[in-house]
A protein has these predicted regions:
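Class I S-adenosyl-L-methionine
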Residues: 1-205
Length: 205
């Protein structure tokens, strides 16, 4: 199930069956997969240094950090960054070494979704932002986040896992890169897309 996720991700409980390199064809397609006049964003646990810098009119790929140090290093290198924080780190804004960690607004307000976040410009879709977006750990495995034991991925348990497994079992005649490139063309003007509710950009074994 975690085949496209990096084996090094601390939230990944199945590193032995996970990716050790990026699917470059898929990454190229993903960066271009933006609806016309729309917005697209996603997250990756792969080392930010192995992913091209974000560009205008391309998908915003956020480096998803597992530790504060990772988050600060990524942010200070000019990367759009998110941080998966322990479930106890619930403040709206944290200031760490002069950098703001802004909690996802949807975690505090049930009326906010990705679609209406930031008045139509979702925080995670914004490039060249001066803050890190913080996601407080949630789900059945939330207490594992920030601990030495690997695990804590929110998509592992609950309803998300059913869709994830079903998607993984689907048979297709073309690569994910081709399928994504064709699918994005079918979306209406101005659509917003959050790629990868689960999974990553790794080359599946």
């Amino acid at each position: 199930m975690y085949g496209s996720c990096p084996a090094t991700c601390s939230l990944n409980p199945d590193g032995a069956n996970s990716a050790i390199e990026i699917d470059q064809d898929y990454l190229s397609a993903l960066r271009k997969a933006v609806p016309k006049k729309g917005q697209a964003w996603t997250y990756s646990h792969f080392d930010y240094a192995t992913i091209p810098q974000n560009e205008e009119k391309h998908t915003t790929i956020n480096y998803s950090a597992d530790t504060v140090i990772q988050a600060l290093n990524s942010f200070n290198s000019g990367r759009e960054t998110t941080y998966t924080a322990p479930h106890t780190m619930t403040d709206k804004v944290d200031d760490i070494q002069g950098v703001r960690f802004v909690r996802c607004p949807a975690e505090e307000n049930k009326k906010i979704t990705c679609q209406n976040c930031g008045s139509g410009q979702p925080l995670c879709a914004r490039q060249k932002r001066d803050y890190i977006v913080k996601f407080t750990a949630h789900g059945a495995n939330k207490k594992k986040v920030g601990q030495e034991e690997k695990g804590g991925c929110y998509a592992g348990p609950g309803f998300t896992v059913f869709s994830w497994k079903a998607t993984a079992k689907q048979k297709q005649e073309v690569s994910d890169a081709v399928k994504l490139s064709e699918w994005i063309k079918t979306l209406p003007y101005g659509s917003m897309i959050r790629h990868h509710v689960a999974g990553d950009i790794g080359l599946d074994k």
